[in-house]
A protein has these predicted regions:
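Active-site-adjacent mobile loop/cap segments within catalytic or ligand-binding domains
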Residues: 249-305
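C-terminal single-pass membrane-anchor helix
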Residues: 304-363
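Bacterial N-terminal signal peptides
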Residues: 12-21
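Membrane-proximal low-complexity regions enriched in glycine and acidic/polar residues
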Residues: 176-183, 187-266, 274
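Short, basic/aromatic beta-hairpin or loop at an interaction surface
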Residues: 29-43
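Sec-dependent signal peptide cleavage junction
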Residues: 22-30
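Catalytic-core regions of hydrolytic enzymes
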Residues: 125-201
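Non-catalytic propeptide/linker segments at domain boundaries
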Residues: 49, 56-117, 122-125
Length: 363
């Protein structure tokens, strides 16, 4: 018979394993239910976020100033940040993504996958409402990006699956779609959103055209966080060089946002609910050009992008399987009360969790 303290410890370990497997606590990925302001060391507002801020979150401003949240006042919905320096020092060289373009297989191999976790997001100017359960405006923006990519010879797959309601479990619901899209071996996996801050924060002019800025969002609680961040920073660097003002900033927040599934997974926020939808749709054309340059050198698929497919997916799957096995082991110990019985039960569980990947244990 297992001692009470052992059962409690085992339950705690099982809960931890499941949290790591299926994502951070739901509250860490609840967006749009509040408006937090980030205050810099000089007391001036740096940015706002339609969602909570947490100690440890990071922010890369449009001018590449790099900040980390040092304290949070949830009652006032404010956070204070410390200045860390310039974020440009460790940006990967542009050629790291595009130098293999000459040796690429051709246009037929270029593929970018997209979906929209917050399936109701819409634009007041254009949709007449900020939230639509059918025909949401965010899908018009995603379609614009898809068309712009395809115009450049890049195949784009945009899932129209919906994951309503817009709540803390939306990312859990969209995870299956993200996993299905990854089976096609895309060079990037993009979650298309819009923000919910005042419109003036996203208004910009690029090449004489009034369009919306785009925020890049990285989840910092996953094993691919460093690569997700590097990908976001490279996109910003390329955009800043060719289309200054297009990328608003990069927010690195608590949560995983399904980005643990792939190093080139990224969340993009096209404008805000108060900005004209047309401006967000027009921004998509510029983003498509930036993605083409970063991933394919503007003309062909980069070796760096190609190489990330198999290995990255395998690492992500292996990480998930390992955690699933850990959860199964703890559960077996709890339910059987002994190591010997638990071992036999674990063998059966591993086979079930992995789909027979490691074979069935003989009973």
């Amino acid at each position: 018979m297992t001692a009470p303290w052992a059962r409690r410890a085992a339950c705690a370990l099982a809960a931890l394993a499941l949290v790591l497997l299926f994502g951070t606590p739901a509250g860490a990925e609840t967006d749009g239910d509040c408006l937090y302001t980030l205050i810099g060391p000089d007391g001036a507002a740096l940015t706002q976020r339609a969602g909570r801020m947490y100690v440890g979150d990071e922010y890369i401003a449009g001018d590449d100033g790099w900040y980390r949240v040092a304290s949070v006042d949830d009652a006032a919905q404010t956070a204070t940040a410390e200045y860390l320096g310039r974020s440009t020092e460790d940006i990967p060289a542009f050629s790291a993504y595009a130098e293999g373009a000459k040796a690429s297989k051709g246009d037929g191999d270029k593929l970018i996958a997209m979906y929209s976790t917050h399936s109701d997001e819409s634009y007041l100017p254009g949709d007449g409402t900020a939230s639509k359960w059918k025909g949401a405006g965010i899908y018009d923006v995603g379609d614009s990006l898809k068309q712009a990519l395809e115009a450049r010879g890049i195949k784009a797959v945009y899932s129209k699956e919906t994951f309503l309601p817009h709540d803390a479990d939306a990312y859990n619901r969209s995870r299956r779609t993200a996993e299905e899209l990854l089976k096609q071996g895309p060079d990037a996996l993009l979650d298309i959103h819009r923000d919910a801050v005042p419109a003036e924060q996203y208004e910009t002019e690029v090449d004489g055209e009034d369009i919306s800025k785009v925020r890049l969002f990285v989840g910092r609680n996953n094993q691919n966080a460093a690569e997700n961040r590097a990908f976001a920073k490279q996109i910003k660097a390329a955009a800043d060089e060719k289309y200054p003002g297009l990328i608003k900033d990069i927010f690195i927040g608590k949560g995983n946002y399904n980005q643990e599934l792939y190093p080139h997974a990224l969340l993009l926020e096209f404008g805000t609910h108060e900005i004209e939808k047309k401006k967000a749709m027009e921004a998509a054309d510029y983003i498509a050009d930036v993605l083409d340059n970063v991933l394919y050198g503007g003309s062909a698929k980069a070796e760096g992008a190609k190489g990330v497919k198999g290995g990255a997916v395998a690492r992500g799957v292996g990480w998930a399987v390992g955690l699933a096995v850990l959860a199964a082991a703890v559960y077996a110990l709890i339910s059987t009360g002994g190591l010997k019985s638990a071992w036999h039960k674990l063998g059966r569980s591993v086979s079930e969790v992995t789909g027979g990947l490691f074979g069935d244990r003989k009973r």
